[in-house]
Amino acid sequence: MGLTLGERVQHCLLVLVSGLFLALFRLLSPGTKRPKHLPPITNPLLTLSAVQLAEKIRRGEVSSVEVVQAYIDRIQEVNPLLNALIKDRFSAALLEAARADKLIKEENGGEEVLRNQFPLLGVPMSVKESFGLQGMPNSGGLKSRGKVLASVDAPPVALLKRAGAIPLGVTNTSELCMWMESNNHLYGITSNPYNLERICGGSSGGEGSIIGGGASVFGIGSDIGGSIRMPCFFNGIFGHKPSRGVVSNDNQFPRCSGLQNEYTGSGPMCRYAEDLLPLLKIMAGPTADKLTLSKAVDLKKLRFFTIVDDGGSPLTSPVDRQLVEVQKRVAARLEADLGVTVQEVNFPQLKYSYQIWDTFLALPDKDGKPPEAFVELMADGGSVWPVWELIKRIFGRSEHTVAAIGLALMESSHSSKSSEFILKQKEDLQREMEDLLGTDGVLLYPSHPLLAPKHHHPLFMPFNFSYTGILNILGLPVTQCPLGLSKERLPLGVQVVAGLCQDHLTLAMALYLEKAFGGWVDPGVV
């Protein structure tokens, strides 16, 4: 038994209509001049990892004030082009940097004491606006929440600050953090540092853009369908969605409801692979004990697998040939360097990735309480009628984006009963994937079927996120790794997946792939 006839017809119509509108959009879009990218980085402090900066600051080789000021200067240089950081706290950050420098001068216990107590002392960071950062906006990109300020820090933000990190500000998201382009009617649209005509991804797109543009050392994102991994892929940086239940999702807006907390992962985003593990360890707090992050990894003793696409879902775009080829190059490099065999595998259930993601996000919690409806989040205590919002949008009068209105309309067409076929597909996929990976398996899987699309084009390819979304439902750890640039000078990349609580394996792979393929590339020199 497969999808019902009605479900198949609905999905086919969505794909057909999306394709027709994309063709029309391309036809009517005005031509533009040669795409612009960012100016190159000139300050060498901006090319150091968080680990390196923390060490230099502790040793007095550079002051925290110097580092923070260098990043403020870079933000002021590139943010007018990117629109990634939507509210800064530069004055407060400089005061905190001065206090960090004072603490270092007065510490009698030496560098080791500082390293143990404050591993990130004096290092600047950025924060996704949906996370609570005390005194800063916390709207989730919803215009009606434009004056809402966070009263407390989200737990992972608090842990990073306690470790000595200094927030520079908060970054843009998609409306209600449920779309793959960071655009809303409160802050506007955020661009890709490698090509300003392209999307930066979502919903942690502001983080991806500001970090990829060399204007933040590292940041923090949340991921319910790829919201860390897609921005990291499009912006050429590293990101990690942890195993389920490792990092707290509290004090974020939108809040998780139903079973969404199980499928949402908060994690680090950065330009350098060596930062991933220490950042994850700090963000997880005591829950880090669920993982074996300090365990040494011998890549030669791992088993490697690769999946080249989702099996041909009619809802998703074919995987770009350059992404197929770079994933093959990763497999070949692993075999040559490590003497291992990378086995190509296939899971027929992946063809239903979108339907699985959509079904499981709508399930009630253990007490039978359903998740808060998307349209209720849009209404923010008032009332919203999606059809009326669409009409208003046509005349430029709606406070909501086309993407959010479309999601609300799709939600209203959902069946109240979950498909038994889809429930079984997920159950089978979960079992087979966990059996395959075990405690020593690593899987390569495309990050997205396309390179960073042009602005607004995802509206006509709405299901491509399912390449990342399916892994949220499985709850497995995934590290997004950059793999150089395409012929269009856009980032290439791959997802690296491991078994539950085997995060240390994917983080070790990130270090290997950075060395093998070069890691992050300054977008100003492309």
Swiss-Prot record:
The chain crosses the membrane at residues 12-32. The active site is at residues 128, 203, 227. Belongs to the amidase family. It is a single-pass membrane protein. GO terms for cellular component: membrane. InterPro entries: Amidase_CS, Amidase_dom, AS_sf, FAAH2. Its EC number is 3.5.1.99. Keywords: Hydrolase, Lipid degradation, Lipid metabolism, Membrane, Transmembrane, Transmembrane helix. GO terms for molecular function: fatty acid amide hydrolase activity. One of its GO terms (biological process) is lipid catabolic process. PROSITE patterns: AMIDASES. It is found in: Membrane. It comes from Danio rerio. It catalyses: N-(5Z,8Z,11Z,14Z-eicosatetraenoyl)-ethanolamine + H2O = ethanolamine + (5Z,8Z,11Z,14Z)-eicosatetraenoate; (9Z)-octadecenamide + H2O = (9Z)-octadecenoate + NH4(+). Coiled coil: none annotated. This is Fatty-acid amide hydrolase 2-B.
